[in-house]
Amino acid sequence: MNSKDLIPQPARDDNHSSLRALFRQYLQSEQTPAPLTWESLTTRDGLPHNWIYDIFQDSSSRVWVGTWGGGLACLDSGKWKVFNKNHGLHSNEVTCIREDKLGRIWVATDNGLNIIDDGIVKNGGLAGKSLLNMTFDVHNHLWVGCWRANISGGGLFCYDGSNWTSYTTRQNLPGLEILKVFTDSSGRVWVGTYEQGYGAGVGCFDGQNWVNYTTQQGLVNDCVYSMFEDPSGNMWFGTIGGLSIFDGRSWHTLTRRDGLVNDQVFCMLIDSHKKMWFGTEGGISRFDGEKWISYTRKDGLVENLVRTIIETSDGRLWFGTYPYSPQAGGISIVQYPPEKSLPDRLLDLLPDSPPPKHLPPGK
């Protein structure tokens, strides 16, 4: 797709020229995309479960994998270490992993928050809350989004190191079921909402007030799973109806007719080579500012539904999948741009001991 095909929402200012300038500024088009070699990690390689909800690399280069049903796995020096309820996790359904400035690992689960400090699992608070996403702001305050409002109340929580503050619709939070929490370069906190699949749009908190955006303002769909800020300060939102781009004034939309492989966008990333990657229900789409390239199971992915993306410090991209079948799924890994010896480098990460038996599916 050429950026001139960006489609503005009706009744919004046409800002195509500025978006074209944006893409030229920090994205570089590929004339001939190089073929990619995909590798995979599954329960056969030591993962405790194939349903992957989050992947995170910490400051020590360890890779943490949150699974839905198998707990938390950590890949350190080529060996897997698994944490689950037997080790003190509140739940084996792990939804988000982050690291604080002290090097502690915070783990959001479907039943509360844990902290892993020097290998010891500790209680992190919010017991009984069904947590889905979290982030640290510039002040090292932790923002945690809750969903399943009918079970655990929902809402947004902020921990300043001593006390918790809660935000609900009474404080003008757009909804009670929070799918995504993000802090931008200005320190503002953004949330994406679910609301039983209908969504309530996105909210932006500047420390004092909430400003909310829905389809009435130009968002393509009110159910928002993912977001990022690009190098020019534009906000990108992944919804179940496509992508929305907000430059602070105007809204623009990208959908399947523009080149996305699927309109349900669960995760997104700008890599170190200035390429955009989008994980969807139907595979992965890569955008270089002009052209879309998509990858599915036919190209080597372990599963089409991609729930999370990270780029590790060695330049490899990890895609965590969340299939509808417990026998499918796992992690797909690719070197981009392609480099030689990827299979050898991947094998160096895998544990030498025999992998555990396949675990029974989670809920």
Describe each model-derived feature in a short phrase.
Residues 1-363:
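Carboxylate-rich, polar loop motifs that coordinate divalent cations or form catalytic acidic clusters
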